[in-house]
């Protein structure tokens, strides 16, 4: 397999679009409803929270996996504080194994285990080009990755995106009704 390094893998666009759409469909009606119900939380505070939450969500979805001849690393843009999301870097030569762990929902995630066995690093599984990344892991480490599959399949996010679209239709009706009642 011929690769031109460094390579950068980002979170899948389908996942980003779905999660951002879900966020807005769940939050946008709130300031309008707060206004017409005279809620104790003012609409301006809700708008501020929505914008701040959006910034946090975009930050979390801006993860990048960068691979080169010597290293795999997970990074985030410099505007994301390191206490919020910390990246990591691991030389290929220091990777001993990939260990699977069952999630609370019954899925499998994989961790790179370093040679010192003191640290483990989560294999990013929601990136576009996941199979290419897994092939590079095999090429660089010699670890058998034939059984490794993405944590969630694209159809799951497509279903969530379709359901979110229906929710947005209801949101539109809710917002229009709230604006109409406010007049």
Q: Each PLM stretch: what is its role?
A:
Residues 70, 77-79, 100-103, 125-126:
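Surface loops and adjacent helix of pleckstrin homology
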Residues 28-32, 57, 171-175:
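Hydrophobic membrane-targeting signal helices
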Residues 1-38, 118-120, 132-168:
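N-terminal membrane-targeting/pre-transmembrane regions
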Residues 93-98:
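Structured surface patches comprising rigid loops and adjacent beta-strands/short helices at the edges
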Residues 38-46:
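Short, aromatic-rich membrane-interface segments at the entry and exit
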Residues 102, 106-136:
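Canonical phosphoinositide-binding patch of PH/PH-like domains
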Residues 168-183:
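Juxtamembrane boundary at the C-terminal end of a transmembrane helix
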Residues 50-91:
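Conserved beta-hairpin
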């Amino acid at each position: 397999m011929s690769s031109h390094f460094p390579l950068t893998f980002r979170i899948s666009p389908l996942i980003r679009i779905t999660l951002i759409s879900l966020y807005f469909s769940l939050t946008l009606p709130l300031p309008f409803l707060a206004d017409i119900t005279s809620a104790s939380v003012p609409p301006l505070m809700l708008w501020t929270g929505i914008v701040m939450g959006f910034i946090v969500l975009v930050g979390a979805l801006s993860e990048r996996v960068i691979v080169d001849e010597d290293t795999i690393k997970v990074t985030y843009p410099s505007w994301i504080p390191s206490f919020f999301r910390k990246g990591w870097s691991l030389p290929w030569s220091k990777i001993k194994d990939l260990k699977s762990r069952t999630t609370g929902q019954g899925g499998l995630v994989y961790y790179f285990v370093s040679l010192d066995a003191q640290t483990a690093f989560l294999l990013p599984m929601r990136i576009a080009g996941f199979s290419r990344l897994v092939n590079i892991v095999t090429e660089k480490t010699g670890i058998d990755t034939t059984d490794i599959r993405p944590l969630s399949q694209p159809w799951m996010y497509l279903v969530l995106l379709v359901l979110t679209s229906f929710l947005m239709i209801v949101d539109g009706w809710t917002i229009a009704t709230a604006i109409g009642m406010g007049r």
